From Swiss-Prot:
All ranges on the Intravirion side of the membrane: 197-212
Keyword field: Disulfide bond, Late protein, Membrane, Transmembrane, Transmembrane helix, Viral envelope protein, Virion
The protein's name in its UniProt record: EFC-associated protein OPG053
Superkingdom of the organism of origin: Viruses
Assembly mode: Component of the entry fusion complex (EFC) composed of OPG053, OPG076, OPG086, OPG094, OPG095, OPG099, OPG107, OPG143, OPG104, OPG147 and OPG155. Except for OPG095 and OPG052, each of the EFC proteins is required for assembly or stability of the complex.
Organism of origin: Monkeypox virus
Modification(s) after translation: Disulfid bonds are oxidized in the cytoplasm by OPG088 protein.
Gene: OPG053
């Protein structure tokens, strides 16, 4: 897989932004994880999975930073598309990131109903790359069942949208004219990864992979 070209989606940009925010925040993220991701399931094709622990003592903050990263990344899309994705996920773009979103309310209810104590299972949907390419899917465990639930929802939506090489990993450096060009390119190149489906189920189980 190392010899193939990496296939980027909006989720890659989102997770880069999210990790940056977690790293820059003053609250330490090296606390003992209250929640571990015990299993990741989905349909995988040419997809590498990485689990990263960035556990925080403030679960509300981790969710807020996640919403901030999501809003930043989908700002690259035309307004109609970004509002459709935000509505699908359960985030109101007219609210500030610190407002409790529909997504967060749903995830709070999910964690309570499923009585998640220390091990959590995630279903990330599809992770597929074309022949000769691979996708790196990075899952960030913040130690919060609610935030992990939010991440699960976001990955299912953003991992369907292809990102041309011209914009990959450059989210913090856009100027206004570059953003206009990016929006046009995304409209042209956006593809649904589900069109290259392959029904191949793969499971990650806690304790069998090395955390990084």
């Amino acid at each position: 897989m190392a010899e193939t070209k990496e296939f980027k989606t909006l989720y890659n940009l989102f997770i880069d932004s999210y990790l940056q925010k977690l790293a820059q925040h003053s609250i330490p993220t090296n606390v003992t994880c209250a929640i571990h991701i015990g299993e990741v399931i989905g349909q995988f094709k040419n997809c590498a999975l990485r689990i990263t622990n960035k556990c925080m003592s403030n679960s509300r903050l981790s969710f807020t930073l996640m919403v901030e990263s999501f809003i930043e990344v989908i700002s690259l899309l035309p307004e109609k598309d970004r509002r459709a994705i935000a509505e699908e996920i359960g985030i109101d773009l007219d609210d500030v990131p610190s407002v409790v979103s529909k997504l967060e309310k749903n995830c709070n209810a999910y964690a309570e109903v499923n009585n998640i104590i220390d091990i959590q299972k995630l279903n990330i949907g599809e992770c597929s790359a074309p022949p000769g390419q691979h996708m790196l899917l990075q899952i960030v465990n913040t130690g919060s069942a609610e935030a992990n639930c939010g991440l699960q929802t976001i990955v299912k939506s953003l991992n369907k949208i292809y990102v041309p090489p011209i914009i990959e990993n450059r989210l913090p450096y856009y100027d206004p004219w570059f953003l206009v060009g990016v929006a046009i390119i995304l409209v042209i190149f956006t593809v649904a990864i589900c069109s290259i489906r392959r029904n191949l189920a793969l499971k990650y189980r806690y304790g069998t992979f090395l955390y990084v």
